[in-house]
């Protein structure tokens, strides 16, 4: 059973305020070896040193310990994926403690590597995580309307060692698959994140005009150290230190960092609560780009007209709100690797004069011209409220994204070097969003009903002309939706002798009919020969669907409350979306 306990204390005086909170949570999990235990504490303190000067601190810390059954850190195996694909009727564990095999009875050798119960118990030990976040701030108010703020935030994350014991299928002895020995691993992962920001705010009224202005700057830095050491052949399953193992000691480690610097400003104008204007400008620099391309500039503005405040609409009693909106703005995205714009090398061994030499090899290509991906959004909208019960919004928008960061296929001459992302495409999204809500009361029962709907159509407006890019089944081609599926079309499932006769006839007419894709057997798909050459090849693939982003999304919510009792329900859905499962587990 799960435990969750919290205690809060708050108080203070006219000048000093404090809040202290502590929490303990213990969730044993719904499966073996999947529990999580956490201690957390929070302290908020602020003091008004002078009428014009306030200082404060917010501190938060957690210490969590999780069992590692669901974290297959020795591989990329996904427990839930294999759970869905496990052979029906499997004996997960025999009375003598051995784990059952997932193979068909005729398979040799038998294997329990994907037995989900074994997967839960493969990994023994705990991962302990300490996370501390502290924020210090100060606020100056030199005169009415002007506020100056500054803050510094520090986050420290530390994950302590883990270890692994893997078990043999037949005799229940410790082993790693294929090695016949046990293994212990210690990992340390330290992350430090710092953020500094400063803000200057000013607000004033001139006649019926309210003016609010903000300027500021911020800087963020991130550093990560990761270290791992391992040894094999544990002398005892009860001893989990590195010195308790006797063979094949290894060690590895990495360091990475990135930084961001930003300047920004905003002005809000409000005339008589009728006419609204907001203008923004921000400049961001990211260490993930070369100096020449590091800065991105992103302006935006919005206009609003509250028509219900106009004199000519005051007499419409059933109209509570009618607001027209228009906006235009840009946003930046720097979602690339920390060093994609740089050449970097990795230690690599090679043979020279019949001796093993230690050297360096370039394992990744660079793209020094990488820069910000930028989205430009134009939006028109209406907010309304009627009869003090019905409210809603309607929005129509166009979003053009330029310089999209994507990975392009590399020519074979590049070898096995990793290819960085490029600013290689432009995509346009156009759509409409609608939401409606009804709030009412029947007797002492309050209830609400609401719904939302959106339609979005996207198209690649610029890429490489008629040239396409494939990532699995996701295709990028100018004039098509992004990530439209490019797949073989299924003609039938081979079930009868007549179906198999078609396969045999194709192979008789052309021995290479199934050279690229294996010859289908009973229960397999027979794909369509689209180009009519008698072979099933990539040339028979077709475009399917509207991409991996849904064209239509919708939702419905309703609820009620009565004398302290409440009920609510949310239903959500999406349609006109296509994607392909490429990675599926086997029963081996």
Task: Name these PLM-found stretches.
Residues 30-32, 287-292:
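Solvent-exposed loop/turn segments connecting transmembrane beta-strands
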Residues 7-11, 41-47, 134-140, 198-202, ...:
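Residues on the lipid-exposed face of transmembrane beta-strands in outer-membrane beta-barrel proteins
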Residues 4-30, 42-48, 56-58, 151, ...:
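Predominantly transmembrane beta-strands of Gram-negative outer membrane beta-barrel pores used
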Residues 1, 30-34, 40-131, 149-261, ...:
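Surface-exposed loop/interface segments of Gram-negative outer-membrane beta-barrel transport/assembly proteins
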